[in-house]
């Protein structure tokens, strides 16, 4: 009895210590959030003060409102339950978070960014967008439970890489807009004003040495401050759920939701690498070489940004932050920490056409037939998918070569034109397949398990 009593008391003491530890972590996190809210609010006031004389009231309105929002959140953290407020705010936002809405937001923003590039490259607009993104991230972090508040190394790497990518994309488009304005006025681009000879010794070596020291120091601080995302030793009796790949491969894992493993893991990455390798040989346009420009290369820039940001980065973000157990889409609510959307069983195109639209179930009896007849019947079953893919990958390039893309066809020649169309149509097939999965619950356009072929 004494032993059991001592064990119970020790267990209660350990539990109380754990609770006190989580309370300390929660207090530190809320304190850090309040400090960040105050600092960002002060930064917005500094922007307003510096732009007060030369900016209009419309340009000063948004940073003023953002400063009030951040100061209000900081004040709420002092006098009220900040995490409760942030949980309610994140719950209201999570209602609109779906794979379709995230993709639509990214794709739509890319379209508007290229359409109104001059507007979005202004400093005030970029500052407002940065404030909104930081506010969303802080609200998401502040609304988590204490045991979920630790940001892993993979998550931190993704956030940092996304921030660096967004900055350099914005900076490149800003340089392109500036060069377009100069060339429109009859001047040379900024890059043409640089000296033909750039000193490399010792000027460049000094810069490289300083950068190497800074990067090494950053890696040391990273290793000391951030816990490495290492899993426990492998146990054949325990399977992690979800078992996620590293952040640089999680995009391919997310692509498995929409494509077969042979397509998502082999064919599509291989075509992406081949496309990047042969791009200099397919694109012989001398414009835009050596300087930033948007007006002279709109199609090339739009295709690259859509493939890199609209597809690859979308897959990484959804796979890293919005996939839970059984790879179900995760959303947050005020009643439960996370809710998993249970996906319905997807249908193939042949099942939708023959069974749902025409009411024909003849192909279900194919297993009783001899093997030769099963193969013939399988081709007849997948006839809608074969015709659709043939029209997309063969008929559409043939029609474009005789109408909209006649000049490109004559300039590139037959071989280069068809190879370029194969790369472009394959890339565009990825978002089309996503839309078909979201809107029509379509799994495969072509499903031939007899030959282990799924597309």
Task: Give residue ranges: language-model regions.
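Inter-helical loop and helix-membrane interface segments of multi-pass membrane transporters/permeases
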Residues: 10-18, 79-93, 146-147
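Hydrophobic cores of alpha-helical transmembrane segments in multi-pass integral membrane proteins
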Residues: 27-84, 94-144, 154-179, 191, ...
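Extended, regular secondary-structure scaffolds
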Residues: 183-194
